[in-house]
Amino acid sequence: MYINYLKDLIGFKSVTPKSDGAIEYIDDLLKQHGFKTEIKIFGDSKSEQVTNLYAVFGSNEPNICFVGHVDVVLAGNHELWHNASPFKASQQDDKIYGRGAVDMKGAIACFLAASLDFIKNNTDFKGSISFLLTSDEEGKAKHGTKEMLQYIYDQGYKINFAIVGEPTCEKEIGDAIKIGRRGSVNFKLNIEGLSGHVAYPHKANNPLPCLIIILNELTNIKLDEGIEFFQRSNLEVTNIEVSNNTSNVIPASTEASFNIRFNNLHSAETLAKQVEEIIKQHCKEYKVDYKLEYSSSAESFIQNPSDKIKEFAKVVEHTLKIKPEFSTSGGTSDARFVKNYCPLVEFGLLSETAHKINEYTKISDLQKLYDVYYNFLMEIL
């Protein structure tokens, strides 16, 4: 059934933060199989409204919860997709194409099939199975999983273990389980000089040489050597703006944006202080003014592998005959919210085609993911 579920889910044009009916489809399906469900819409304005779902079967512990998102990123040029339709699933041999196939409608489809089959085949299991789904993970992630977790806990629900279905695997299904994530902090630096004619540089103060020196130092600084489960923290320049289309004018100002992905040796605040010290030193030397802004969408986190995390890893190894590696690589995810409530793993499909034109998953990979999810439910419940 996971193939049918995936094809149906791809058919919803659920570009973040819209559900476009995807969550309602899952809600109806789970209701038909005895789940208690509730849809909540959060958001400050109509344009920001986010659809969220919590559905649970059973009332006993442990409550094993699948956490995921139905929203997807923009599909780009539709003409470049198979059948010129990213929101109509296209099956070719062992592959299913469509926006969200791996990120992360494929994982949702697999857990839907695994949980419904498990309930059908095991009428007296000891715990509960639940879903927490949102339409706001790819965007601001403000009114999605974070708010929904607080809401369900206020209602008296408790999650004992969560599986976040992000596409975590690198080369084959089962090679990686994420137990943490790097933090992310974005910077915007504006440097103010003095404009003038290029023939009279002594009457101006070009902000660009100062910016070049600053960015060179920042990109070459060694923030750390990396630690267990974490690679080295890394800074990448993402944009440089001058807004000067005239070749004989020295610009008055320039702006640069950069991002740091960091491990748990740092926080956004400590990195901001380190970055500003470098900026302050060079701006003083070049006698220019600066303004630095920064914002962090996520701090880094790591979990000590708990018994349930180790149990999940054993199920992966037993099912797929591959020993998974505990990892923290990749971008941010809603796991950063879930970890405040319960232990978790992130485990899903291959990440290779996520967000790309002609995003696809192999049907054989869907089967492997289904098997892991089903076998874990058998083991833990």
UniProtKB/Swiss-Prot annotation:
Q: What is this protein called?
A: Succinyl-diaminopimelate desuccinylase
Q: Where does Zn(2+) 2 bind?
A: 103, 138, 355
The text of the family note is: Belongs to the peptidase M20A family. DapE subfamily.
Family annotation (Gene3D superfamilies): 3.30.70.360, Zn peptidases (3.40.630.10)
PROSITE patterns listed in its UniProt record: ARGE_DAPE_CPG2_2
| UniProt binding sites for Zn(2+) 1 | 69, 103, 166
The gene from which this protein is expressed is dapE
Cofactor(s) demanded = Zn(2+); Co(2+)
Q: Which organism is it from?
A: Rickettsia massiliae (strain Mtu5)
Please name the pathway. Answer: Amino-acid biosynthesis; L-lysine biosynthesis via DAP pathway; LL-2,6-diaminopimelate from (S)-tetrahydrodipicolinate (succinylase route): step 3/3
* One GO MF term: cobalt ion binding
HAMAP family (alphabetical): DapE
Family annotation (NCBIfam families)? dapE_proteo (TIGR01246), PRK13009.1 (NF009557)
